[in-house]
Amino acid sequence: MNVPVLVLLGFAAWTLLTLCACIGVYRWSRIVTGRVSMAEWRTDLPQGSDLYQRAIQAQSSGWYQRATRAHMNCVENLPVYAAIVVALMAMGLQSLIIDRLAVIMLAARVVQTLVHIMLPPTNTATSLRFAFYFAQVVCMIAMGTIIAIAVLQ
């Protein structure tokens, strides 16, 4: 199995881990202990009711909201990277630079998620988070460029 495919699996695993370890544990611990009802988690209010949302923010400084957003960032970017991997596989492209770009992309994704969840949204934290997001975008654009060059040859 090549590195971009392994990174894709790692990206998917990280997305699921973020869901289960952060959002899932948080929600289910409150439901199982009877602090909220299952109906509290409505689809039109991702963090629960307005009253409950204010209580959460007061208790956790928005940790749950940041975890939810970090998970959604993973979900939003996973298909983009998956499309790149499909194109790489279809064209049979493999190189050390592609492998390194893939690994850097996943490392940047993991750090961006951790910064997003663990640090309150200050200018410094947001800039740091954006830097790791930008690193991912650069890696994916570079891999896309390699694919485009191979197509044009």
Predicted region positions:
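Alpha-helical transmembrane segments of multipass membrane proteins
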Residues: W14-C22, V80, A108, Q112, ...
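Interfacial loop-to-transmembrane junctions
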Residues: V111-C139
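N-terminal signal-anchor transmembrane alpha helix
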Residues: M1-Q47
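Core segments of transmembrane alpha-helices
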Residues: M72-A87, M140
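Hydrophobic residues within alpha-helical transmembrane segments
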Residues: A13, H71, V103-A107, A131, ...
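Membrane interfacial helix-start motif at the N-side
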Residues: G48-P79
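Short alpha-helical packing/oligomerization segments
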Residues: I84-A107
